[in-house]
């Protein structure tokens, strides 16, 4: 009998969470602004998700895009958000703190863990893909293990987990059960089975999304409500949603 591989789905709203569970996900990571890599979801979203699904909910605490070295104002916001999320029923908190030199901010990470555990002693703690930009990933793991972080989300310091498979395998071996290694970024039904076999991981993280169109902007392609990238804006008449069919396709591929 094959060992169970846990599948965590990255979600950006309440509907995403419901569709993830419908597709068979074991757990979700709840964010907002997935295009920016995932930011803190609203407390209303956390409450709505917890009212709608029964699988564990890991809540992202990331107040802004653009790095992981935060001001004191950012940090106070993160602490308040995390406490509110735990009180709203979050099963885990996802976060990441780096110093200006790119190393794990040991002091702030330790203090944040203290804040979380004061609110709920057994809250699950996850250090996110900030680890993918540290100068020494194994040194970073040592710090996180020492501080008692439960899990780390990583692409193996590459653009996708598939490209970072060798590093992820080495991280898994180095951790040796002292911290969970959760690979994510670019994993789908077409590559997940081979990726698992190559790395030996026991869990995977993916988004499994499809595009949905909103006709309310009337096809006006001159209007952009956000910023521009290379002179172009993100289309305002479309957004991505978790697709239960795609979620199930990943699960089917895992089981092959």
Which residues are covered by each model-predicted region?
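Structural motif corresponding to the early beta-alpha repeats
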Residues: 47-84, 95
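Hydrophobic faces of well-ordered beta-strands that scaffold small-molecule active sites
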Residues: 5-11, 28-30, 57-61, 93-95, ...
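A structural motif corresponding to the C-terminal end of an alpha-helix
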Residues: 23, 52-56, 87-92, 115-123, ...
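C-terminal alpha-helical cap/extension of soluble enzyme domains
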Residues: 175-256
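Active-site-adjacent beta->alpha loops and helix N-cap segments on the catalytic face
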Residues: 15, 34-55, 73-75, 97-120, ...
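Catalytic cores of alpha/beta
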Residues: 12-23, 66-82, 132-147, 171-173, ...
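N-terminal pre-domain/capping segments
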Residues: 2-28, 33-40
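N-terminal amphipathic alpha-helix/helix-capping segment at the start of soluble metabolic enzymes
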Residues: 1-10, 50-51, 220-226
């Amino acid at each position: 009998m094959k060992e169970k591989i846990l599948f965590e789905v990255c979600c950006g709203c309440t509907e995403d969470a419901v569709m993830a569970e419908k597709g068979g996900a074991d757990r979700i990571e709840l964010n907002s602004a997935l295009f920016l890599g995932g930011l803190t979801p609203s407390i209303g979203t956390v409450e709505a998700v917890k009212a709608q699904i029964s699988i564990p909910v890991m809540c992202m605490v990331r107040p802004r895009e653009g790095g992981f070295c935060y001001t004191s104002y950012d940090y106070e916001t993160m602490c308040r958000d995390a406490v509110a999320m735990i009180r709203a029923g979050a099963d885990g908190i996802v976060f990441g703190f780096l110093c200006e030199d790119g190393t794990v901010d040991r002091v702030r990470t330790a203090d944040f863990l203290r804040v979380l555990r004061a609110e709920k002693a057994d809250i699950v703690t996850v250090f996110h893909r900030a680890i993918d930009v540290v100068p020494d990933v194994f040194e970073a793991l040592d710090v996180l293990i020492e501080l008692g972080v439960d899990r780390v989300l990583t692409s193996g310091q590459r653009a996708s987990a598939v490209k970072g498979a060798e590093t992820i395998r080495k991280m898994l071996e180095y951790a040796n059960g002292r911290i969970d290694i959760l690979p994510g970024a670019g994993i789908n039904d077409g590559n997940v089975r081979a990726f698992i076999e190559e790395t030996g991981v026991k869990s995977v993280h993916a988004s499994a999304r499809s595009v949905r169109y909103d006709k309310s902007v009337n096809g006006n392609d001159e209007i952009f409500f956000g910023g521009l990238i290379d002179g172009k804006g993100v289309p305002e008449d479309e957004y991505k949603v978790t697709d239960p069919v795609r979620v199930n396709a990943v699960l089917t591929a895992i089981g092959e």
